Amino acid sequence: MSNPEFQVVPIAEEHIEGFHAAVDSVARQRRYLAMLEAPPLEESAEFVRNNIRKGHPQFVALAGGRVVAWCDIVPERRETLAHGGVLGIGVLESHRGYVIGPALLRAALAQAKIAGFKRIELTVREDNLRAKALYELAGFVTEGIKRKAALFDGKYYDLVLMSLLL
């Protein structure tokens, strides 16, 4: 398969349904996200609108006009932690293994720095070696392990806590 052409753009209202469908597709693989399906469309729409309204970094990758990946960074809710953001990212299975993930990550991290974030953190399943390698290449470091933190289909998985200081 050849490297698909794609474009990384800030998310807009017109991308909400595609974003929701992409999240649902990745979630249903039961491996990459901490959910088994996307939240209701209305909840996804409010998440996106809130990110747009508040200027939180959220980007999508478009291929053939369709959302094939996303990356967002939202601030921690508590005032004492709000200088830090939590990163979420996903790529449709059909578009993995190219440069989409790194391109999205670069865009979101650059915007996070402009927005004044000082720390970005994430959790990743310990067996998701490709994602861990991507994060390490971007400068994330492991801070710890949450043992048996995720349960998928009756099996427990450790989650790796990673962070990047901006």
Predicted regions and their residues:
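Conserved acetyl-CoA-binding loop-helix of GNAT-fold acetyltransferases
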Residues: 91, 97-114, 132-137
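Acetyl-CoA-dependent GNAT
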Residues: 10-13, 27, 31-94, 105-107, ...
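Conserved G/P- and acidic residue-centered "switch" motifs that form tight phosphate/ATP-binding loops
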Residues: 65, 99, 128
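A short beta-loop-alpha structural element at the N-terminal edge
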Residues: 6-21
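Terminal substrate-recognition subdomain of acyl/acetyltransferases
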Residues: 2, 155-166
